[in-house]
């Protein structure tokens, strides 16, 4: 086929025309990604300019920059651009690039503007923000799709961008995300409800501080929408103030589907206040306008004109494709004269002009609050339809300390007493958020979730900035198509059982017939005084109409004279809601009665319930409630659940009495009892509370019964019976075994008006209550009367007295003729010890700390060791009162039974065996150790030698702990300490899930002795073990008084023992606690809380304080508490609330435990059980295997301690 020259030229022209347009970027690297095509990454402030060149064999080539009308506070970029057109190319220069220049730049031709032949490059300009700062976008939701413009300023992995809708992550949105445009939500992904404003939030997962908020509504509340055109003023984020540069912009935007000349025959005109705008630019070209007004700047790609103040612009040249025209007035150096109304007029040849005014007003002093954007300020919504109220505002000057915002709600309610102001706080139905949207721009939001009709009203946000207050108000009407009638009575004494009200006659009442509705509705109010009559309406003058915010209806005031039935009807959209109520004059009450126990004494108070009493609870309910179930229910605070009791239901007169009998009551029945009146639809409770006192038998207040009273012959004297109990006992007095009737008994005291010689002798009072009897013995010495017999002779049986005297005489004749005075005293101590074995102790005494009931403790002779089985070796240490020597205990039995025949022990004895007081102190320490059961973290008693106490042989034998005291152990290993603590945990947590501590990972690799090493794992173990031991002592109970690392022993296997239970301090004076001069001297004051320092008050909570100090010692490797404070100012230092600083080797969780132990109030300190739980939780989280190893080691130690009795038991005990 032959082709003519003409056809060839035409074909060549077509081919040339169809060649794609190309775009070139000068001086910057162009990257490519399949998701967005070509792109360039720039940095604001670093890369100043960028030039683009568009090539192609087409007419009218040009580069179209991105439209930026949605950018927050930034003008169009025409002011910073240059352009030059040559044949087949178009050169475009963007100067001083900014973050807001981010977008797609198109190379297009007027011939193929919508063709695939055009080319594009996307430019990212990054500064600080990941997302391009855009203004809040209002979107006309048409049911198809919504664009959430989360555009990024740099190329990112789209998986790191998340979208949240009303604070809920929308996972399905990721598939529609393009970082050039944002998220595209289809109708299937998210559907907006009518009248709703939805809060969208874009988050960048690699940086929690990077996010962006959008509020998308059905329409822009500040825009006028007419025939597919938006006409509105753009509100800048900047705050106008004197001397500032400022701009305002009026926009006309076409949003319809017509793509050809959508703005043809449309124009907008700006007018300034005080005739400052110079007019007269009709029919002028844009170029001419620029010439005639120096303030006019025009960029060809944009359809926006910028004019200085004193300028009026009416017309511009628009291309056939432009969909938006704008007018901007720039103010250079604002003055007070610039304030006023600026008018923007939209002129359309076929319609009436549309006018929008902008009120430019600012505080001359500088302090301002500028409202930038608000959500729709009048809303009518359906019940349970969520919505969002928000305000974006700017403050000047920038001072966050002086800016405050407060949400409130105004509504009228006659029921509540008139106009109400409710301060809104965060809750389930209303959530307040505050965010910063710029350097001086803030965003306050109130999310109304599932609003009820009762949430209608005027919502007010009050913003305060220094001396300026500005309010934004919303009128919210929540409506429901369902009628809702209510009948209520405003009376606090009313008893309401379902639809029956019971109250006294002649009561003044106000009864409300209301419909819960925010809009007008029909309400009918009727009554009757006889149940056989028809309901009838009220006369109008009897009712007062109510038209409140969400309550419509009537109020009726009357005096109750007889039973009356009321009916309230609400009719809405052919639906009816009816409520009935009956007012009658019956009443109710609950009460209880006490029947005393048969063991009660006559003097017990009749109004107090004690254990063992019988209690009868009665609930009186009006007979009108006969159709309801009525029963008693008991809430037990210990069990945290309700216990239902059967009840009797006798009916008397017009009342129903529901009775609950509780016999032989205990303290577990203390609590609140509810009388329940219930049917299928309703439940009402009447409550009464009872308190049951725990009973305790009489007990001695001073732990002994050996007081002596001196009296003068002929003078009066009083004897106090130092016995108490619960209930308070009855007191009966005896003299020499016979009732004493001479004196007058007043409470627990015996008053004798005149002492006689026959009063010389032993008195005792018998204190009796329902739980038992205790006797207190008092010796009265009347001056001039003969001495009485020995004290103990009067408190033992007569036969034992006789035997005792005979034994004493024989001992004096044959056993004591050669004894020294000191030996006599020791002999007396031995005999007194034997006597103590015969006492029985009350339960109250047993509840006292063990060191306070030392006189009532006995020595368990199962611990007795034959001295011949004990080998005493070298001295291990000595102190003021005692000496500790190393030794071996040979097994009492000749059989080995699989154990070593010799046991290493520590042997403690006094420094002066002839000193009776010293020996007494050591014997009391022995009794105390007998009273403490074995525990792997408490020093264990093995046995004792007491048979020859009368000649000074008293030895306390304990297990031998071979590692020395903990304080020296820690100090000696400072140089080898391996710190496993790192910033967020411990170094042994290389694999957190395995939780393998260093001490177990390297166990097989350690070439040095484990005892000579020290690491953080050891410190955690030691801290937990001390808490274990102290919790064991606290449960006995035993108060240590002197817990410190120097009084803690450690074994070669790093198991600790708490030692030195503090009896020495009890028997010395206060000098032990006095401050000394040397900082290194281990002063107890540095381990004591303030109450112990000032009042010498020692409790388990003072031990907890000392435990916290021990932890400080442990994690400072034997450091001295309060190292920077000298001794002479230490007490004042503690008084002012100072505590030790966190040690460098200590995890913040462990330091929290220390600070809890150092609370000023003892009640605020934790128990040792709570300390154990905190420590275990910490170790379990970071090193579970370490915790398992500790528990395994302690179990092994416990088994070893249980075997000590094999070295003490006699052969007969072993075999039989």
UniProtKB/Swiss-Prot annotation:
Active-site residues, as the UniProt record annotates them: 1042 (proton acceptor)
Record's subcellular location: Cell membrane
Presence of the UniProt keyword Transmembrane in the record: yes
Predominant place of localization: membrane
Topology in the lipid bilayer: Single-pass type I membrane protein
Record keywords: ATP-binding, Cell membrane, Disulfide bond, Glycoprotein, Immunoglobulin domain, Kinase, Membrane, Nucleotide-binding, Receptor, Repeat, Transferase, Transmembrane, Transmembrane helix, Tyrosine-protein kinase
Gene Ontology BP terms: cell surface receptor protein tyrosine kinase signaling pathway; nematode male tail tip morphogenesis
Family annotation (Pfam families): Ig_3, PK_Tyr_Ser-Thr
UniProt xrefs under CDD domains: Ig, PTKc
Topological region Extracellular: 1-789
Catalysed reaction equations from the record: L-tyrosyl-[protein] + ATP = O-phospho-L-tyrosyl-[protein] + ADP + H(+)
E.C. number(s) listed in UniProt: 2.7.10.1
One Gene Ontology cellular component: plasma membrane
Residues where ATP binds: 876-884, 908
Cystine pairings recorded for this chain: 619-675, 721-765
Keyword ATP-binding: yes
Occurrences of domain Ig-like C2-type (ranges): 596-691, 697-783
Family as reported in the entry's similarity comment: Belongs to the protein kinase superfamily. Tyr protein kinase family.
Main function: Receptor tyrosine kinase which may be involved, downstream of pvf-1, in the positioning of ray 1, the most anterior ray sensillum in the male tail.
Annotated protein name in UniProt: Tyrosine-protein kinase receptor ver-4
Organism, scientific name: Caenorhabditis elegans
């Amino acid at each position: 086929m032959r082709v003519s020259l003409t056809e060839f030229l035409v074909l060549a022209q077509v081919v040339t025309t169809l060649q794609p347009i190309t775009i070139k970027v000068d001086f910057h690297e162009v990257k490519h990604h399949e998701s967005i095509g070509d792109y360039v990454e720039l940095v604001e402030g670093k890369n100043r300019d960028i030039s683009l060149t568009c090539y192609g064999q087409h007419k009218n080539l040009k580069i179209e920059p991105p439209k930026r009308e949605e950018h927050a506070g930034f003008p169009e970029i025409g002011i910073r651009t240059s352009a030059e057109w040559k044949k087949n190319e178009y050169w475009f220069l963007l100067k001083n690039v900014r973050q807001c220049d981010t977008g797609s730049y198109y190379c297009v031709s007027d011939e193929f503007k919508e063709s695939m032949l055009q080319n594009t490059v996307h430019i990212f300009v990054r500064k600080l923000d990941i997302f391009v700062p855009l203004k809040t976008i209002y979107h006309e939701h048409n049911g198809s799709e919504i664009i959430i413009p989360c555009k990024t300023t740099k190329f990112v992995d789209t998986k790191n961008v998340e979208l949240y809708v009303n604070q809920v992550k929308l996972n399905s949105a990721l598939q529609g995300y393009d970082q050039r445009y944002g998220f595209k939500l289809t109708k299937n992904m998210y559907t907006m409800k009518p009248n709703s404003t939805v809060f969208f939030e874009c988050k960048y997962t690699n940086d929690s501080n990077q996010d962006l908020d959008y509020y998308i509504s059905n329409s822009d509340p500040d825009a006028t929408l007419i025939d597919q055109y938006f006409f509105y003023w753009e509100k800048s984020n900047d705050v106008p103030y004197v001397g500032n540069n400022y701009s305002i912009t009026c926009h006309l935007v076409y949003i319809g589907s017509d793509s050809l000349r959508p703005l043809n025959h449309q124009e907008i005109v700006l007018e300034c206040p005080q005739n400052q705008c110079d007019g007269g630019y009709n029919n002028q070209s844009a170029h001419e306008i620029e010439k005639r007004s120096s303030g006019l700047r025009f960029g060809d790609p944009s359809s926006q004109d910028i004019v200085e103040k004193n300028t009026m612009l009416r017309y511009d040249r628009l291309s056939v494709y432009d969909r938006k025209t704008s007018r901007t007035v720039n103010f250079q150096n604002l003055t007070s004269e610039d304030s006023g109304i600026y008018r923007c007029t939209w002129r359309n040849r076929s319609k009436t002009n549309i006018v929008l005014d902008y009120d430019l007003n600012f505080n001359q002093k500088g302090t301002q609050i500028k409202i930038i954007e608000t959500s729709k300020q009048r809303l009518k919504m359906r019940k349970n339809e969520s919505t969002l109220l928000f305000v974006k505002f700017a403050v000047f000057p920038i001072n966050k300390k002086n800016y405050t915002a407060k949400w409130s709600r105004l509504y009228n309610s006659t029921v509540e007493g008139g106009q109400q102001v409710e301060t809104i706080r965060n809750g389930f139905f209303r959530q307040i958020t505050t965010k910063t949207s710029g350097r001086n721009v803030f965003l306050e939001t109130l999310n109304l979730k599932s609003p009820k009709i009762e949430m209608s009203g005027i919502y007010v946000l009050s913003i305060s900035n220094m001396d300026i207050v500005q309010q934004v108000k919303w009128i919210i009407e929540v409506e429901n198509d369902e009628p809702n009638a209510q009948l209520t009575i405003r009376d606090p004494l009313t008893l309401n059982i379902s639809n029956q009200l019971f109250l006294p006659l002649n009561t003044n009442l106000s009864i409300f017939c209301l419909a819960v509705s925010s809009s007008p509705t029909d309400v009918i109010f009727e009554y009757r005084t006889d149940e056989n009559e028809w309901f009838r309406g009220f006369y109008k003058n009897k009712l007062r109409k109510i038209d409140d915010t969400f309550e419509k209806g009537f109020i009726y005031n009357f005096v109750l004279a007889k039973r009356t039935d009321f009916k309230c009807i609400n009719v809405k959209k052919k639906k009816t809601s009816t409520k009935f109520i009956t007012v009658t004059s019956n009443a109710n009450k609950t009460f209880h009665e006490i029947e005393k126990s048969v063991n009660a004494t006559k003097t017990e108070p009749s109004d107090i319930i004690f254990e063992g009493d019988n209690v009868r609870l009665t609930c009186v309910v009006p007979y009108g409630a006969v159709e309801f179930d009525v029963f008693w229910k008991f809430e037990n605070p210990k069990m945290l659940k309700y216990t239902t009791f059967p009840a009797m239901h006798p009916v008397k007169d017009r009342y129903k009495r529901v009775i609950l009998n509780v016999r032989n009551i205990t303290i577990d029945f203390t609590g609140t009892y509810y009388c329940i009146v219930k049917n299928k639809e309703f439940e009402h409770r009447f409550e009464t509370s009872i308190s049951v006192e725990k009973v305790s038998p009489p007990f001695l207040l001073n732990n002994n019964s050996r007081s002596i009273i001196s009296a003068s012959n002929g003078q009066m004297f009083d004897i106090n019976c130092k016995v108490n109990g619960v209930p308070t006992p009855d007191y009966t007095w005896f003299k020499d075994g016979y009732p004493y009737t001479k004196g007058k008994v007043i409470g627990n005291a015996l008053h004798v008006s005149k002492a006689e010689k026959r009063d010389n002798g032993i008195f005792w009072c018998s204190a009796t209550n329902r739980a038992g009897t205790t006797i207190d013995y008092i010796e009265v010495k009347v001056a001039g009367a003969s001495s009485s017999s020995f004290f103990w002779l009067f408190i033992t049986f007569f036969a034992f007295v006789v035997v005792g005297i005979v034994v004493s005489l024989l001992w004096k004749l044959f056993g004591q003729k050669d004894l020294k005075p000191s030996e006599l005293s020791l002999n007396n101590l031995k005999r007194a010890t034997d006597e103590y074995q015969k006492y029985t102790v009350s339960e109250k005494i047993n509840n006292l700390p063990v060191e306070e009931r030392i006189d009532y403790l006995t020595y368990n002779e199962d611990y007795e060791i034959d001295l011949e089985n004990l080998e005493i070796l070298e001295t291990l240490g000595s102190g003021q009162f005692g000496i500790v020597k190393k030794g071996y205990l040979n097994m009492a039995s000749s059989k080995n039974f699989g154990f070593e025949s010799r046991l290493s022990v520590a042997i403690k004895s006094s420094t002066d065996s002839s000193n009776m007081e010293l020996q007494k102190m050591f014997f009391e320490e022995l009794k105390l150790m007998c009273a403490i059961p074995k525990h792997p973290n408490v020093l264990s008693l093995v046995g004792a030698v007491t048979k020859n106490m009368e000649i000074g042989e008293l030895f306390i034998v304990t297990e031998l702990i071979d590692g020395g005291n903990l304080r020296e152990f820690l100090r000696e290993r400072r140089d080898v300490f391996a710190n496993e603590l790192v910033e967020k945990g411990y170094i042994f947590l290389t694999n957190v899930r395995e939780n393998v501590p260093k001490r177990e990972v390297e166990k097989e690799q350690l070439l040095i002795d484990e005892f000579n090493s020290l690491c953080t794992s050891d410190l955690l173990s030691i801290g937990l073990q001390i808490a274990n031991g102290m919790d064991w002592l606290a449960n006995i109970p035993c108060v240590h008084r002197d817990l410190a690392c120097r009084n803690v022993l450690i074994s070669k296997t790093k198991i600790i023992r708490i030692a030195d239970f503090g009896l020495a301090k009890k028997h010395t004076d206060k000098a032990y606690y006095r401050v000394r001069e040397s900082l290194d001297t281990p002063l107890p004051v540095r381990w004591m809380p303030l109450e112990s320092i000032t009042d010498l008050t020692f409790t388990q909570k003072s031990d907890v304080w000392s435990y916290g100090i021990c932890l400080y010692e442990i994690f400072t490797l034997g450091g001295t508490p309060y190292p920077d404070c000298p001794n002479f100012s230490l007490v004042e230092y503690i008084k002012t609330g100072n505590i030790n600083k966190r040690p460098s080797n200590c995890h913040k969780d462990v330091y929290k435990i220390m600070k809890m132990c150092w609370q000023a109030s003892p009640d605020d300190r934790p128990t040792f059980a709570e300390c154990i739980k905190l420590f275990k939780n910490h170790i379990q989280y970071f090193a579970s295997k370490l915790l398992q190893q500790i528990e395994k080691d302690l179990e092994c130690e416990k088994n070893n301690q249980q075997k000590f009795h094999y070295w003490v038991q006699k052969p007969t005990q072993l075999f039989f």
